[in-house]
């Protein structure tokens, strides 16, 4: 999305979703933010109806309890919380609320300061390390390794860590 719209006016949501399913995806990541990313809450409902057994991450700027509850109502399985967007009290509250609603929570960090804050969240279990610099929009996939090295070993053993952004080809993942 930082390089323009992902889809054009001919975008067929179900056709694209089926392509992903046929190629073995483990979960959908659905943009619902409308203004900047042209997402739509209806995308989650459509995907849930057609692929009821595949987890769905709602990608949006989540900053209120209502949005967390609405995510559950829409049929998503998980939310994204961007550490940089939230003060610690709100971050912890939304994380706890989501877990109470049986939603998984992908907590996204971009740098060492974000990471320090994220690691203080009680019951943190999924950590996303975004390789995109939010100030310059440049991508450096080595950011994941740099930040993983800052995580205590005892936490690495229990966290699911997701490397986000900057992967264009299979070779990038290797």
Identify the residue ranges that each predicted region occupies.
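A short, conserved beta-to-alpha structural element at the edge of catalytic cores
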Residues: 86-96, 114
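Short amphipathic alpha-helical segments and helix-helix/interface helices
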Residues: 17, 44, 91-95, 148, ...
